[in-house]
Amino acid sequence: MTAHTHDGTRTWRTGRQATTLLALLAGVFGGAASCAAPIQADMMGNAFLTALTNAGIAYDQPATTVALGRSVCPMVVAPGGTFESITSRMAEINGMSRDMASTFTIVAIGTYCPAVIAPLMPNRLQA
């Protein structure tokens, strides 16, 4: 059963199909937009975990390790945030050696906030 508009060219069925199509497209694009951030976050987390593995740092809980790695950048920009203070904090939190904590901190900074490496460690990067 179709109902025609005044000019007889458009039916109620066509209107409903157009509305359904628009709703479907809105859902697809909305879903894609909401997935973009988690996918990006997963890519960075995976890159971080891979870099830790390559550096010889073992971890048991990937999600906790990624969260700890992400916590480094706010420490860098906090007042008094020095490489030594951050490394000490990482060693304290994880119970890892100072050298291991230093490597963890460098990998975290290199992954999540690479722009602060040179200002944070000016004397360590000289050839």
UniProtKB/Swiss-Prot annotation:
InterPro entries: DUF732
Regions crossing the membrane: 100-120
Major subcellular location class: membrane
Record topology, Cytoplasmic segments: 121-127
Key words of the record: Cell membrane, Lipoprotein, Membrane, Palmitate, Signal, Transmembrane, Transmembrane helix
Organism name: Mycobacterium tuberculosis (strain ATCC 25618 / H37Rv)
Subunit structure, as described in the record: May interact with sensor protein KdpD.
Protein localization: Cell membrane
Origin superkingdom: Bacteria
Extracellular compartment segments: 35-99
UniProt function note: Overexpression induces expression of sensor protein kdpD gene at low K(+) concentrations (0 and 250 uM, tested in M.smegatis).
Descriptive protein name: Putative lipoprotein LprJ
Modification note: Modified by Lgt on Cys-35 with an S-linked diacylglycerol, signal peptide is removed by LspA, modified by Lnt with amide-linked fatty acid.
Statement: the UniProt record of this protein carries the keyword Signal: yes
GO cellular component: plasma membrane
Lipidated sites in chain (S-diacylglycerol cysteine): C35
